[in-house]
C-alpha cells in the first residue's frame, strides 16, 4: 500500500512540474507571438504571467522591456533590461538597449564601460558598435563647438 501511494505521489508531482513548465513555455510563446502582432497589452500580460511561473526567464523580461520602450516608460524598460542582464549577462539585445538609454542620458562614461562589455559578447549585433562609436563621436564633436 505504501509503495502504491509513493508511486501515485511521484506521478502527481511529475505531472505538476511538467504542466507548470509546459504552461510557462506556452505563455512566453504566446506573448512573443502577440508582440510580433503588435498586441502589446496582451503580450505584456502573458509575459508577466510567464514570470509568475518562471521568474528566471530572461526572455520575458526582455520582451517586457521592449513593450515598455514602445510605451515610452523608461523606468520600467530599464528595470526589465537590468533583470534580463542579471539573468543572462551576455544578452546582446538587452545590452544594446541599455547603451541606447545611457546615450540618450548623455552618460558617456557608462556608455564606454558598457560598450567594452558589449564588444566582448557581441556575435550577432556587432554592427551596432559602429553606431555607438558614431553617436559618441557626434557628442564629442558637438561638445568641442
Stretches with model-predicted labels:
Residues 49-50, 83-84, 117-118:
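Canonical positions in the second alpha-helix
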Residues 63, 97, 131-135:
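Canonical tetratricopeptide repeat
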Residues 25-49, 53:
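Alpha-helical segment of the N-proximal tetratricopeptide repeat
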Residues 36-37, 70-71, 104, 121, ...:
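Register position in tetratricopeptide repeats
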